[in-house]
């Protein structure tokens, strides 16, 4: 069982830039404002964290619970800098009898830090070599996870000119967009649109993966979703 993580909780970052250890900092979200624990939004995979230098990003999530198609964050999920979220909200846990591994974002979407020679030297000079090694090992583990996990399509949404739609109104020019994990760029994915309890297929779409995302022109207007008598 894992504790659910919310925005404002801290992550711990072992990365070192120059002679400055990152230490870590709070998750700044955006999280999901519509799903709250103790009045605070739950954190989602891809959320940003305060860290030394550029913000860090949560690169993992729990595939068994999704909000708006995005996995929620639980304790021990890792970040792009090689950090980890060591604890969530006490008493708010999810999981099953059989442990489920977290999923990792597409490697193209993870902003891994560039580790320079001066950073390794700075870590040694300041006595932070052990922390730097931990960060490197965690980053290597993230990269390994992205190639070894089951292919997955998630975060399916509709967009118009790059803006996510939350309305049930479907106009021309709308695109169906989804993120993928462990599906190489250039591969074709198929998405079936279902409409009712009988799983009637309205249409099957095909799209090509590019930069860890598939984008498809949505040519089904609202009239297609009226149930046939």
For the regions a language model picked out, list residue spans one by one.
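Short solvent-exposed strand-capping/beta-turn motif centered on an Asx-Ser/Thr pair
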Residues: 179-185
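Solvent-exposed serine/threonine-rich low-complexity stretches and specific carbohydrate-binding patches
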Residues: 200-220
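Exposed aromatic-hydrophobic patches
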Residues: 177, 213-228
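Short, compositionally biased P/S/T/A/G/V-rich stretches that sit at domain boundaries
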Residues: 147-170
């Amino acid at each position: 069982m894992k504790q659910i993580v919310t925005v404002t909780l801290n992550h711990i970052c072992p990365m070192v830039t120059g002679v400055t250890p990152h230490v870590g900092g709070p998750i700044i979200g955006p999280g999901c404002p519509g799903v709250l624990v103790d009045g605070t939004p739950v954190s989602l995979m891809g959320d940003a964290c305060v860290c030394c230098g550029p913000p860090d990003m949560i690169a993992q999530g729990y595939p068994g619970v999704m909000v708006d198609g995005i996995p929620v964050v639980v304790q021990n999920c890792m970040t792009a800098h090689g950090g980890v979220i060591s604890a969530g909200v006490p008493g708010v846990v999810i999981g099953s009898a059989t442990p489920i591994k977290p999923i990792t974002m597409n490697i193209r979407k993870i902003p891994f830090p560039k580790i320079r020679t001066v950073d390794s030297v700075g870590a040694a000079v300041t006595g932070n070599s052990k922390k730097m090694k931990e960060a490197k090992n965690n980053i290597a583990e993230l990269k390994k996870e992205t190639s070894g996990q089951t292919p997955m399509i998630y975060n399916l949404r509709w967009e118009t000119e790059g803006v996510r739609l939350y309305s049930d109104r479907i106009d021309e020019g709308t695109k169906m967009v989804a993120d993928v994990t462990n599906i190489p760029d250039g591969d074709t994915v198929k998405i079936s649109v279902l409409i009712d309890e009988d799983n009637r297929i309205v249409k099957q779409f095909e799209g090509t993966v590019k930069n860890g995302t598939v984008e498809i022109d949505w040519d089904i207007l609202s009239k297609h979703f009226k149930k046939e008598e």
